[in-house]
Amino acid sequence: MHRPNQKQKKMKRTLILTAIITLATSFASAQQTSGTIVYEITTDVEKMMKWFMPDRKMDTYSWKEEWKFRKSKAELKFTASETIYEPIVEETMDRWGGAAEEHTIYSNRDKNKICYVIRMMGKLSIVDDSIPKMKWKVTNAMKEVAGHICMSATYNDTIMGQEITAWFALDMPIPYGPDVYHGLPGMILQIDLYGGGQIYAAKTITMSDTPVKIDKPKYKKKTKTMTVAEYQAQVYKFMQDMKKRPGGMMF
């Protein structure tokens, strides 16, 4: 009896995944393509520290109990062509009780434009660029997130040196997601970063019959902007500098 080899098995899995995505997209094509998603961002501070600085002993650190796990919320508004992602200010506070810094991500698929307005450690960065392509690898793993059946995909983040795992909804054929993540054949409802040290997970999904209102972030015309690549290089340098500090990373 002939047994399928690894190449044939892989081809079969690919065909099955393609069929599932095609069926889900066909089923959902007539559904709403506008709405709002609230994500909860959970940060395991100790796990993040271990990921960023694996050679440093963790027993040299001490945190208040409430600092070990940080939770915040952010909102993604989307239409068929635009998105805007922002923290929910009244629920997103830093660990000293102050308001969270700016972190707005806007995209327009029709114009192939993306804009970041991010203030980190008091420094404002404005990104105005074309939407970068993300090379995802879809796997055959599946699970439920916020009431939706999701498939898994991985992305090799060469800037931070990590493998990112995304879970996208088969019945929401819109290529968006939280923060800067996009480019899958379904809405990203969960993102796992830094070896599970930080997780973005959809908590509520509200669809709309009419397009939600989305405004592109405004900034002074003379403000210097940068490309996505330049911003990524800036973040990488910032992370490396933070690692060298006596106190290490701050989350």
Mark where each language-model region is.
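Bacterial Sec-dependent N-terminal signal peptides
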Residues: 1-37, 248-251
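Extended soluble regions of mature proteins
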Residues: 32-251
